Amino acid sequence: MTRNIVLAFTISWLGIIFSFAQNTPQIKGVITDVDTGEPIPFVNVYYEGKAVGSTSNMEGEYSVDNKAAIGWGKLTFSSVGYATQVVQINSSTRTLNIKMRPDLILSEVIVKPKREKYSRKNNPAVELMKKVVNAKKASDLSEKDFYNYDKYRKLTLSLDNVQTNDSLMSSMFKKYPFLLEQVEVSDVTGKKILPVSIEETASEILYRKDPKEQKTIIKGINSGGVNELFNTGDMLNTMLADVFQDINIYQDKFRFLQNPFDSPVSQSGIAFYKYYIMDTVYVDTDKCFHLTFVPNNPQDFGFTGHLYVLSDSTYRVKKCVLNLPKKSDINFINSLSIVQEFGELPTGDWVLQNDDMVCEIAYMKSLSAVQVRRITKYRNFGFDPLPAKLFARKGKEIKDVNAMMRDDSFWEEYRPEKLTKAESGMNHFVDNLRQIKGFKYIIFAGKALIENFVETGTKDKPSKIDIGPINTIVSRNYIDGLRLRASAQTTANLHPNLFLKGYYAYGFKDKKSKYNAEVEYSFKKKEYLPREYPIHSIAASYMYDNMSPSDKFLSTDKDNVFTSFKVVNVDQFNYERTAKLKYQWEQENGLKTTVVLSHSNYEATGRLFYRTMSAQSAFEQNFSTLSPQQWERSPYDTKDYTTTEITLGVRYAPGETFINTKQRRVPISLDAPIFTLQHTIGLKALGADYAYHLTEAGIYKRVWMGTWGHIDTHLRGGIQWSKVPYPLLIMPAANLSYILQDGSFNLINNMEFLNDRYASLDMAWNLQGKILNRIPLLRKLKWREHLGIKMLWGTLSDKNNPFLPENKNDAMLMMFPGHYLENGTYQYSSYLMDKNRPYIEVSAGIHNIFKILHVEYVRRLNYNHLPTANKWGIRFMIRTVF
């Protein structure tokens, strides 16, 4: 969730600050068959030689920006089976309806009229594409024993479609002339843009076939713009790089916009796309077949576009143009164009040389759009054997220690073309932005909202201490009542290896102070935060606070004001006092090792109490002598218990990538599998009361179902091997708030089931609107379906079962949690599970409501006879996805 909220907020924030009053005028119309009057879908509407245009929808409707004012006076309409039309336009043209005449013969290739049903059988376009797919292995560089090449990438973020002649903007440019100086004309769209951020990366790609390995050596990084206003500004560039990943059309599938796409040059693509031969044309000096392609369903995740294939026996792709269909179900994207150009090396090898992407993004149509431009150049290819030492360094991506400090001479060598005036003056532009009256308050608010922290520094004196998280300042719970908290953490500006953080909280109901202090030493220097990848650190902490047993399952801070509102009354707490020493070592291959030594004391509070079975026997014998207040706080109770633990954990997530926020590190590549294994040893040392062994393991995997979305699966299991009282048994991960949280049960109460062996399955299916997109009244809403099922198997062995007669007077086992009713009856709130009857809850929901809201109806299917059971509920969360 967080990773896309960052990008969505940035887009909205830029749109609000620089939102301009008027948009470029549009030309709209309907394209029909001159003979039948029927609408013609998938007609290409474009300005010749320009990457600006659109495609008609199923009703033959189209819209395109009017570019006559900048000299683009001719609009071209082309479609297989129809004669191409070129129409003269002027700046006043608003409506343009087109009648197209069938033309069955197109440049040596006979095709069937468009109005006939598309067939892949005996289709010359499909037969040609099969030859292209069969020949692509000959152009696959991964078949080489070795290769290396230089890669240059420039990623520019700009405000799109700037109206310099608008009255509102004229006054703004007059007041702030540096804004006008920053405006330039896009060489692709012809629109006026205002660049606000740029990042250049120069790298070398190394590859060997046996053993197969590829490494990226980042030699230089040059970054500037509004992202520099944020100390975690790398979030924006990291997100953009993940969303707009490089595309290899020779792969069967590739990841783009955080979704898998079928390549038009693949076996699966032949089934996914419709292909049409348009003409034979020359690209540079090479004669090529010109093909167009469209998805079978324009709302599925696929491209429309053009392929230019050499008209010789090699069937190599000379040029590829990818566009996103107007009716695509992808959020935020107004338009997208990718142009890839291939060429032959002196060695005869065929390689990608230029990759140019332009994307226009807007969170809302009422806000100005943002243009993302990515230019990638590939050069200096080599195929000689590479020394083994080049592959000895760990990690797929290795950053040169001087990458961020390259001078102008370096960039003159690696930069294939000069920066524009606006791009080269980005730092000066940001300095001018800082001088705008009130701008610092906008940045302050933006930082607080995005980062959830308030900085204490300035531009000249970067923040050494950040105050936050902000959303934990005020919260409430059963013990504290109203709770106020002050938190802070140091940054690498104070020390690049040593970090401090902590909080002080006060509860107005129990009138007690709570606190936490932590010191962490990182063995690697950090740019800002200790959590930056990869982690290699040791930390010591001391905490005293009240905790509900279910708090440990929260993915957010327990004092998060939004999750402090519970669906049930949570009144069973501990006062927890914990001293902890934690060592973490994370390797570039995705393997993370954690060792934790902790010493904790738990004192029951609220309506939680600890009473051994032997003490319960004495309690029952003397029940009549006790007052109701003593039923849950009797002289027979165990006031507290103490543990000393050593925990060893291993986590393996190959290919996982992250963005760093000031509160936590957020994974942005959810396709990576995750394997976890953890063993905890309880030692009867340092005053601890129990000795035990606990083992838990887990697996996560996302499986894509083609056009039917994806299924996320979590499988977990664990065993408490020893005889222990109930606080040390295994309780389900219960989510007691209204906010959805991954990996937890929505309708299980606090400690509702206690087991010493368990297995759980959590499956969530995001259908990506596959069904709702086919319902006419709902299609335009772009709602997406979500189905889920959560299951829990659990059992309690005899040695840990306090309900068995042989354990009635046991001095270690404790009676399960519950509450005394007014008549003195004890009602349990924790229960045993039937090992042959798993707990099941299902959910059905809709997300992408207003592009941001996810709502689910959850239903509990069994164990509803329990007095504390909640049969159903409504849960929600903020979630933005493409």
What do these predicted ranges mean?
Residues 1-30, 45, 104-113, 530, ...:
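Bacterial Sec-dependent N-terminal signal peptides
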Residues 30-40:
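Structural motif
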Residues 32, 44-46, 78-80, 94-141:
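Short, acidic, small-residue-rich periplasmic hinge/interaction motif at the N-terminus
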Residues 43-47, 75, 111, 149, ...:
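Hydrophobic beta-strand segments
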Residues 115-288, 294-302, 364-468, 472-475, ...:
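Structured extracytoplasmic
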Residues 259-260, 393-882:
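Exposed, low-structure sequence patches enriched in small/polar residues
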Residues 47-49, 74-87:
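A short, solvent-exposed loop/turn motif at the edges and junctions
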Residues 51-61:
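Short, acidic Ser/Thr/Gly-rich low-complexity loop/linker segments typical of extracellular
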